[in-house]
Amino acid sequence: MPSVSSSAANGSQDVALSVRDLVKTFLVGGGVFGGEKGEVSAVAGVSFEIGAGRTLGLVGESGCGKSTTARSILRLIEPTSGEVVLTRPLDGGGSERIDVIAADRRQLRELRRHMQIVFQDPFASLNPRMSVGTAIGELLHVHTNLTRKERSDRVGELLSLVGMNPNVADRYPHEFSGGQRQRIGVARALALNPGFLILDEPVSALDVSIQAQVLNLLEELQDRLGLTYLFIAHDLAVVRHICDDTAVMYLGKIVEQASTDRLFTAPMHPYT
């Protein structure tokens, strides 16, 4: 594993995620007629840190690069350059800082245990032909040696954790409301006990009353499990409610970052 450094004492490392000069460019042009190719910088040198157990909001209008940043951090798409350092706990105590971008395929598979994502549209991210119990247990099947009975028990625990009856595990995504499906998405993301979650517009597709319920659930889970969140959104009211710190993104760059209270009361950048 491409370790950056390690700490022998629990809690001595208080930065859960450090992103430095993250760049993602896409080739454009060419096409069937062989026109001139160019590059578009969707993410142009983004840097930030998230303290352990805290929530950083990443805000900006559609197309500014928020979701591309998230997917680059997890390497769901490959970043062009930069550094993403994740702090993960070590067996027996202490912690280790891992360069996600430098990890090979096997190492990245191991890192998936420690970082997960909850998508905006839970229906699109759930296989309609797969029961929710199977969908939640899929990661357990791939990444653990649990027996079928142990996986089933764990799925029940996860459903209970997000406020759902374990008996619904045999039902299918279309049988649930949008808010329930998002709870299922959260349960699946928590299956491997990750310490870091990216929440990519997790409530934007929900009614306002359901938004509040899901946001309260996310806060409860953070307090209970010590989770660290990168919360991507365009709704400033939601960000103000849940985020400790906020970074404002514009045209692929972060133009301002501060505590959420300071940013909302005394913004410094004109775009903010």
Spell out what each predicted region is:
Residues V32-K37, G92-Q116, V142, R148, ...:
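ABC ATPase NBD coupling module
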Residues E61, L206, I210-T272:
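P-loop NTP-binding/switch modules centered on Walker-like glycine-rich loops
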Residues G92, K149-N167, E220:
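Conserved ABC ATPase "signature" region
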Residues I136, V186, I210, V214:
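Hydrophobic anchor residue at the start of the ABC signature
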Residues A191-G195:
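A short, proline-enriched helix->beta-strand linker immediately N-terminal to the Walker B motif
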